[in-house]
């Protein structure tokens, strides 16, 4: 593998690990602070899939000798806080957050597939992309009042997610 291709693969592994770590933190905050039993059940199911994704990228980081992002402490605090905040605001904000983050992640994973030469990694990312698309649909389908405030909130979350992706690739 050329140095350029190794650098690209390292960035993909690092950013995907960071994203799954951040998602895990968001769901942990939401699960801890939500008061709705059915919502908590849905979030636990999603969190289980995110745990599988995170575990895969943790193992891959060790195998490929890729360092994690230096932003992990910030992503831990920020993700958990975002999760707690949305849970306090209620189900629509929890689901809007899920929809917004997963919309960006689906596009992000799609953009990576053609850059990866290793078939096993490519297939895992395709599987995770399908999982994330399912989370995105769950979010979209469970929002009851998609008003102006919620639309602005989703736009804000999408911007933050894109920034986190760019930063995590490099730092």
Go through each PLM region and give its residues.
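Non-heme di-metal
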Residues: 1-171
């Amino acid at each position: 593998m050329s140095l350029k291709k190794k650098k690209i693969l390292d960035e993909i592994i690092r950013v995907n690990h960071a994203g799954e770590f951040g998602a895990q933190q968001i769901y942990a905050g939401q699960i801890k602070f939500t008061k709705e039993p059915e919502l908590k059940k849905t979030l636990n199911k999603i969190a289980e899939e995110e745990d599988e994704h995170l575990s895969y990228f943790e193992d891959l980081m060790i195998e490929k000798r890729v360092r994690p992002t230096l932003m992990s402490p910030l992503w831990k605090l920020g993700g958990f806080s975002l999760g707690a905040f949305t849970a306090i605001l209620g189900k629509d904000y929890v689901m809007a957050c899920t929809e917004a983050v997963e919309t960006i992640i689906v596009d992000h994973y799609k953009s990576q597939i053609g850059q990866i030469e290793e078939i096993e990694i490519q297939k895992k990312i395709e599987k995770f992309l399908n999982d994330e698309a399912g989370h995105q649909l769950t979010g979209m389908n469970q929002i009851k009042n998609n008003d102006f405030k919620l639309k602005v909130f989703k736009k804000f979350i999408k911007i933050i997610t894109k920034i986190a992706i760019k930063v995590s690739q490099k730092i």
